[in-house]
Amino acid sequence: MKTVTVKDLVIGTGAPKIIVSLMAKDIASVKSEALAYREADFDILEWRVDHYADLSNVESVIAAAKILRETMPEKPLLFTFRSAKEGGEQAISTEAYIALNRAAIDSGLVDMIDLELFTGDDQVKETVAYAHAHDVKVVMSNHDFHKTPEAEEIIARLRKMQSFDADIPKIALMPQSTSDVLTLLAATLEMQEQYADRPIITMSMAKTGVISRLAGEVFGSAATFGAVKKASAPGQISVNDLRTVLTILHQA
């Protein structure tokens, strides 16, 4: 399986990498949050742009991205607009969503974009090609905050992302029971052992699914999300606790 290298970070080997999400509503908050995050122990900075109020002003969005890049130049920057239908803060049209991601790519400030699988097949394929032409990696994602589908469906979605040339397929699902967590872990393992030719990221959310955020190295998930301050999804734990557990499991 090939790895993915962003800056000096190699994703897909060793302990799972820690991603943290920064959720700021304006330029002032971006500045203050960035300074606070700079001291934290993590590997990838995700900017959750759906929390940003001034989305219609592309210049403001790019100015905020520039602050993040300058404050943490060594950290890979993942640009993510999470749609309302997949648990995000704002609803925008598909056209606006694609345009926003293209503007981020054009800026030269971001290393990776998050692209939702169910945006539309043609738009997804075109945006992946556009990102790759500008040396930007694509995390292709799917989120369900209500349920966990069968393992076969989880694997089918991850394989579809892979067929669309995502650099890193990602899926996050809500368990309704402990057995749902096992379904997610079993699907992750089967994907990793039988189909994946690149790193994948999977997680089961909420308190029930916490084990999935810790056991990625065992089952085949290459990264996990931790919280510096406010969690961006149910079940996230602090980056310090997360690093401790990931290191223990890696060294065992």
Swiss-Prot record:
Keyword set includes Zinc: no
Pathway field: Metabolic intermediate biosynthesis; chorismate biosynthesis; chorismate from D-erythrose 4-phosphate and phosphoenolpyruvate: step 3/7
Binding site for 3-dehydroquinate: 21, 46-48, 82, 213, 232, 236
Catalytic activity: 3-dehydroquinate = 3-dehydroshikimate + H2O
GO biological process: 3,4-dihydroxybenzoate biosynthetic process; amino acid biosynthetic process; aromatic amino acid family biosynthetic process; chorismate biosynthetic process
Class of this enzyme: lyase
Keyword Amino-acid biosynthesis (UniProt): yes
Example of a GO MF term: 3-dehydroquinate dehydratase activity
Keyword annotations of the record: Amino-acid biosynthesis, Aromatic amino acid biosynthesis, Lyase, Schiff base
Residues at the catalytic site: 143 (proton donor/acceptor), 170 (schiff-base intermediate with substrate)
Enzyme Commission number(s) from the entry: 4.2.1.10
The protein's assembly and partners: Homodimer.
Family: Belongs to the type-I 3-dehydroquinase family.
Xref: NCBIfam families: aroD
Functional description taken from the UniProt entry: Involved in the third step of the chorismate pathway, which leads to the biosynthesis of aromatic amino acids. Catalyzes the cis-dehydration of 3-dehydroquinate (DHQ) and introduces the first double bond of the aromatic ring to yield 3-dehydroshikimate.
Name under which the protein is recorded: 3-dehydroquinate dehydratase
Organism: Escherichia coli O1:K1 / APEC
Lineage: Bacteria, Pseudomonadati, Pseudomonadota, Gammaproteobacteria, Enterobacterales
